[in-house]
UniProtKB/Swiss-Prot annotation:
One of the GO biological process terms: mesenchyme migration
Disulphide bonds in the chain: none
The protein's name in its UniProt record: Actin, alpha skeletal muscle B
EC main group: hydrolase
Chain positions with N-acetylaspartate modification: 3
Residues modified as Methionine (R)-sulfoxide: 46, 49
UniProt keyword Kinase, yes or no: no
Any one GO MF annotation of this record: hydrolase activity
Family designation: Belongs to the actin family.
SMART domains, per the entry: ACTIN
Gene: acta1b
Residue numbers carrying N-acetylcysteine: 2
Amino acid sequence: MCDDDETTALVCDNGSGLVKAGFAGDDAPRAVFPSIVGRPRHQGVMVGMGQKDSYVGDEAQSKRGILTLKYPIEHGIITNWDDMEKIWHHSFYNELRVAPEEHPTLLTEAPLNPKANREKMTQIMFETFNVPAMYVAIQAVLSLYASGRTTGIVLDSGDGVTHNVPIYEGYALPHAIMRLDLAGRDLTDYLMKILTERGYSFVTTAEREIVRDIKEKLCYVALDFENEMGTAASSSSLEKSYELPDGQVITIGNERFRCPETLFQPSFIGMESAGIHETTYNSIMKCDIDIRKDLYANNVLSGGTTMYPGIADRMQKEITALAPSTMKIKIIAPPERKYSVWIGGSILASLSTFQQMWISKQEYDEAGPSIVHRKCF
């Protein structure tokens, strides 16, 4: 960590599920908390508790029983700006305990983010938080930097959205980006549904969080789905038990791999889209023939929804089946990929060559929010 906390850049990766915030130059985010804003369902149930009108992040999570939880970022894109402002405020003042007007701030955005959204982010940073300088970077590009590459194809799958982003020499190729509105939150919902079929009922927003935990602890990707289903049917070797907060123990079997199988077979949840292996292949095929070899050899996984055991082997198998037979295919799954977007931002914001890339307050005052399209690419 740089000693001069006072001038260090801040890096804030706003995900649909989790906000990752910290200081440039660090190797991991200081603060990771849920992107949720909770408001009390009933006025004044907690008498004398000095009830607030809204709670953010972990505090909202811990009081979820009496709150209505809202996610201001849906499918990777900010949809509720008032709540988003609360989240940024919480990141700066409560988590990092810094004054944003003293730090350049690097924010991240989803690929193919609407132009108006980048402008609004820029405006809020300069006008509400008075940052001295800011920059908006594409999430997948940062993940690629974090893996030490400038060329490759990133499969970035978080809580709200999944993207395939081919990147050549540090630039995302927008015409070949694939977006799939299927990610962690949908997998959690699907797991809720198939657990209900087993006779366990999970319905409320609070119970969804329990199911998310089951998913993170017990799910995995099968190398061969049909084989695995056969194994699960004929023996109990794949069954695992999980203790609920109230002490009840539930058993989960083929749901463990049926849930993430949805990534490869979106028809499981009624989506007509191709699976992540096909979207990766389609994205590569939309790129210039001369760079495809580099993309096949540099398939980088990023985001929490790529954390399932077995996912890299399965991707290797599926893409090998689609690609030309002589092609060298390599899937890179860094152990820290949950946070690789943030780590890439930390690396980028601390490079000496990057310092001229910041949008300064002065440039913003002269040109307005549209400056972001000229400076952040």
